[in-house]
Regions:
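Accessory cap/linker subdomain of secreted extracellular hydrolases
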Residues: 1-3, 8, 71-172
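Loop/turn elements at helix/coil->beta-strand transitions in domains of secreted/extracellular proteins
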Residues: 9-12, 51-54, 76-80, 174-176, ...
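Active-site loop signature of alpha/beta-hydrolase-fold enzymes
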Residues: 21, 89, 220
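Short beta-strand immediately N-terminal to the catalytic nucleophile in serine-hydrolase-like folds
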Residues: 57-59, 84, 180
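Glycine-rich nucleophile elbow surrounding the catalytic serine of serine-hydrolase chemistry
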Residues: 59-69, 187
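C-terminal subdomain of alpha/beta-hydrolase-fold enzymes, centered on the catalytic histidine
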Residues: 153-223
Length: 223
């Protein structure tokens, strides 16, 4: 559906899957391999006979994160980004105010555990959050989920989060970006911060062409 949407508008549409999900090989670990895999995809595109030197990226949530991961590579043809309900700091989203965001983190872990999305039953969530320790909430809900454990346990581990969020991506951004946020979305505070950082710290051409749209929506319903 997404591919046809862009193709009807004259674009060559390429849909990149996530490592270890659906038909993609490898091990699934959210957010960790997106830069490596994104760069490899851009390098592949450059070698195609139909490539005209221009790449535009679009995606929401973790697929918005995938764009930020390669936002410093205009040398690979990247010209612009459209990031919806995602920011440069999953660390801040998961640990906003110093407490782990159990609703967001556990819901996503249950839904994405394995090679395909699964239904999240509220009874599973209710059962999981009624007891301690927090790091075992995944076990109570569905079974051991290593990346969820890492999110909980590594709140103060800068090296861990740098592998996911990078370092100052709003400063190293090299192409204009359209940010779309929701008033009821957990990424809203960090998306607003991203926008302010870009317009004050990115180069002039990028800063003047970057925009932020905020609308009356949440997260999952928009993804």
């Amino acid at each position: 559906v997404i591919g046809r949407y862009w193709a009807r508008r004259g674009y060559t549409a390429i849909i990149q899957g996530t490592r270890g999900r659906y038909g993609s090989g490898g091990k699934f670990y959210p957010l960790l391999y997106e830069r490596q895999d994104g760069i490899e995809t851009l390098e592949w595109i450059r070698k195609q006979p139909w490539f005209d030197g221009n790449v535009f990226m679009w995606g929401a949530s973790s697929f918005g994160h995938s764009q930020w991961c390669v936002s410093d590579r205009p040398d690979l043809g990247l010209k612009a980004l459209f990031v919806q309900i995602a920011s440069t700091s999953f660390r801040r989203m998961f640990h906003d105010g110093g407490a782990f965001s159990l609703e967001s983190g556990l819901f996503w872990a249950i839904r994405s555990r394995g090679s395909q999305d699964r239904e999240v039953k509220m009874t599973n969530l209710d059962q999981a959050v009624q007891d301690f320790p927090l790091v075992e909430a995944d076990d109570r809900a569905i079974g051991d989920t290593p990346f969820f454990n890492d999110w909980v346990l590594n709140q103060n581990d800068n090296k861990y989060w740098q592998k996911i969020d990078g370092v100052n991506r709003t400063h190293t951004l090299q192409v204009p970006i359209l940010l779309m946020a929701g008033w009821f979305d957990p990424f809203l505070p960090t998306q607003i911060e991203d926008f302010n950082q870009v317009i004050h710290n990115a180069n002039d051409n990028v800063a003047t062409e970057t925009r932020l749209i905020i609308g009356p929506w949440g997260h999952a319903n928009e993804v």
